Amino acid sequence: MWGGRCSPSTSSRHRASLLQLLLAALLAAGARASGEYCHGWLDAQGVWRIGFQCPERFDGGDATICCGSCALRYCCSSAEARLDQGGCDNDRQQGVGEPGRTDREGPDSSAVPIYVPFLIVGSVFVAFIILGSLVAACCCRCLRPKQDPQQSRAPGANRLMETIPMIPSASTSRGSSSRQSSTAASSSSSANSGARAPPTRSQTNCCLPEGTMNNVYVNMPTNFSVLNCQQATQIVPHQGQYLHTPYVGYAVQHDSVPMTPVPPFMDGLQPGYRPVQPPFAHTNSEQKMFPAVTV
């Protein structure tokens, strides 16, 4: 009765043995995968050989060490034949990264200097400043108001024109009123000429019309004396431009100034000198001669 049945202890033992076998297989696989990696290299013919993980498929489980030379590499189990791959210089393909080798960089790989970005940004900033300055200078030159060439060429002429008022072209109505005022002034001057003679004119106003100096005070600059009679008549305005029409006919009364006799000059600063006699003889009884005074 008991011989046909399996005890629970027997079944547990079988399960334990299966687990042990599975663990052994896993450990063997881990030991197989824990070997060294032989990096790729260039052989003597210049052909690139791809790297591999030790042990390979045809090697034994204990061949976990990369052995050989830099030009020929293989897997072995002898620690004395181990290859120092760090001293080889042909284990790097140009332009291709080698898996498992992060300690060495390719010959073509060059690090970018840290100052290059700052140099680029500074160059752009300086170029922007220069371009802005040029644009501002062009805008200021284009928008600047242009100076009148006549004003800049003849500043003295403008001052002369301000000093000497120009005679505008008179209209027909102004011409008729000026003719009436001139006739009235000439009649009044002829009426006053019988009673009193006009004062002697200087050479400067020799060409002025009759009644101009008697009725109107004209402020004439000194540089008008060099002008001839024709130019003087063109420059001096008509009397109707300075006086209103109701006051043109009135003449300015000129009073005669009596001549005062000139006393003889006497030099009293130095002693012993006689008084200076005038060049002409005086017949007036009011004049007296004073003797020289000695100090």
Swiss-Prot record:
InterPro entries: Shisa, Shisa_N
Mutant lacking the gene: phenotype: Mice exhibit no defects in head development. Mice are live-born. About one-third of the homozygous mutants were normal and fertile and about two-thirds were dwarf. Reduction in weight gain became apparent at the postnatal third week; about half of the dwarf mice subsequently resumed the weight increase, although they remained dwarf; the other died within a month after birth.
UniProt-annotated stretches for the region Disordered: 87-108, 168-204
Pfam families noted in UniProt: Shisa_N
Keyword Membrane in record: yes
Record key words, sorted: Developmental protein, Endoplasmic reticulum, Membrane, Signal, Transmembrane, Transmembrane helix
Signal peptide as annotated in the record: 1-33
Membrane topology, as annotated: Single-pass type I membrane protein
A biological-process GO annotation: negative regulation of fibroblast growth factor receptor signaling pathway
GO CC terms, sorted: endoplasmic reticulum; endoplasmic reticulum membrane
Ranges per topology, Cytoplasmic: 132-295
Sequence ranges on the Extracellular membrane side: 34-110
Membrane-crossing segments per the record: 111-131
Superkingdom classification of source: Eukaryota
Compartment(s) where it occurs, according to its Swiss-Prot or TrEMBL record: Endoplasmic reticulum membrane
The keyword Endoplasmic reticulum is assigned to this record: yes
Residue spans of biased composition, Low complexity class: 169-197
Function: Plays an essential role in the maturation of presomitic mesoderm cells by individual attenuation of both FGF and WNT signaling.
Family: Belongs to the shisa family.
The protein's name: Protein shisa-2 homolog
Organism encoding this protein: Mus musculus
